[in-house]
Amino acid sequence: MSSLSKDQFVSVILSTKTVAAIVKAATKVPRVSLVTTADRNILLVPLHGVEGEWKPVNDPQLEYYDTYPGFLSSRSGPKLSNDVLNKAQKDIAQGKPVPMDLTCHADSKTTDNLFAKIIRGELEQWRVWESESHVAFLTPFGNTYGKTVLVPRKHLDSDILSLPDRNFSELAGAVWDAIQQIVRSDLGAERVGLIFEGMEVDWAHAKLIPICADDGREPLEQPFMETYGGSVS
């Protein structure tokens, strides 16, 4: 997937919506997440145990990997220092100042959403990329160096695989653009993993996880979970 053009990438990601609908029906779950390490495979993970009405679900277990462990995980990590976040921001931006367009199109129901506040510049942040319609910033609780969150400037449902095709395609296009920024940066990432999950904040968002060369150790394995516990891998 890392070698796909923007149009090809959007087309492939868009096709997962149809499969996700089939998975939902077959497994009788209200939500399905997407995980890909940007190789040849895209995983669609049914979120067993999640209720139909959105409620936040957070995994209390924290983790951090200095090198790629052989899998992706959406778990949070311990709070990173500002020095680490500043360096990661500089690496991704290649030392150039990142524009800060604070335009946000939240409605009255979502104006106090965490992401709305970040987009408007009301909270400390480490923005690494933006366009007229989307913003990408480092998460201070990343489980790997340079972990990035991408959000639209307007509120969209956090169940990304159920978004209308137009909104979904625009988001996928922004993901591709942000991935190119990360891969071409000084971060040293060979490719960038992608996760659609949406159970921490009720605002559509993509998690972009830089995948750098491993250190040759045997890849770790994540345990099988029968119900969703706040993270996917």
Placement of each model-derived feature along the sequence:
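HIT superfamily nucleotide-processing domains
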Residues: 1-233
